[in-house]
Amino acid sequence: MAHYFVGDIQGCFAELQKLLAKVDFNPSRDELWAVGDLVARGPDSLATLRFFRSLGDSAKTVLGNHDLHLMALHGKLKRAKPSDNLTEILESPDISASIDWLRQQPLMRELPEHQLIMSHAGVPPQWSLEVLREEAALVSCALKQDDYLEALIAQMYSDSAEQWDPSAIGIERLRYCINALTRMRYLYVDGRLDFDCKQPPENCTNPQLKPWFEFVSPLRQSHTLVFGHWAALMGNVGDTKLKALDTGCCWGEHLTLWHLEKDQKITQKKLKKS
């Protein structure tokens, strides 16, 4: 069995299919792991989501910020922007089933036999594996409740939860977890999340900011961390135990697939419109 990890697809379904054909992906024997953001911006979010649902246990994804945004749009909590490119999926007859499927997906996944953790944006350096498991599980539990829209999705949009506080309770605790696992790029030197800078490290002009993965972290030493979200990195992090897989396909660059067992990356350039 092969484990394939794919970067932010964001509706780039044709490129995904090209990649899977290159490696002869077979769901009866292989697994496809996605770092989140299955939807938004790209041309075919609906086909992407339906494909992942069809794979059953052969597909493993985590939630990204755009996947959570889709829940908010479906719940009429936010107004869609043209750049979201989600009209087709929101008007699809199986949108409720798609949302229910997304609600069952976690914010982090583990592959213990390979000492591997996958999340959309990364892992806060302050967290141990036990804390990561606990905090992600709290969000997953909230998403599965009948009142998830009012209790979580409607209140998750906030930059106030920028600092990890183990004594926080309720929505503030959940907000930090969502912010950290789906939105994080840079941290201030005191550990606070920054929500503004998206540049690669070599272009960041604020001396108070460092990429989250440059902080000392117990998980950075013990595990391979697989993440997406930060397209400007283009996969370049200078550490073999960090797998940054968002390579900007929806922005005209390429989609990246990582074969775990071979430690090999395969790419597919963004296809030109016919």
From Swiss-Prot:
A GO term from the CC aspect: cytoplasm
The keyword Hydrolase appears for this protein: yes
UniProt cross-references to Pfam families, sorted A to Z: Metallophos (PF00149)
Keywords of the record: Hydrolase
Residue pairs linked by disulfide bridges in the UniProt entry: none
GO BP terms: RNA decapping
Keyword Hydrolase in record: yes
Enzyme class per UniProt: hydrolase
Molecular-function GO terms, alphabetical: bis(5'-nucleosyl)-tetraphosphatase (symmetrical) activity; phosphatase activity
EC identifiers of the protein: 3.6.1.41
Catalytic activity: P(1),P(4)-bis(5'-adenosyl) tetraphosphate + H2O = 2 ADP + 2 H(+)
Cleaved signal peptide residues: none
InterPro entries to which the protein is assigned, alphabetical: Ap4A_hydrolase, ApaH, Calcineurin-like_PHP_ApaH, Metallo-depent_PP-like
Source superkingdom: Bacteria
Family: Belongs to the Ap4A hydrolase family.
Function field: Hydrolyzes diadenosine 5',5'''-P1,P4-tetraphosphate to yield ADP.
PANTHER family given in the database record: BIS(5'-NUCLEOSYL)-TETRAPHOSPHATASE [SYMMETRICAL], METALLOPHOSPHOESTERASE
Protein name: Bis(5'-nucleosyl)-tetraphosphatase, symmetrical
Chain's gene name: apaH
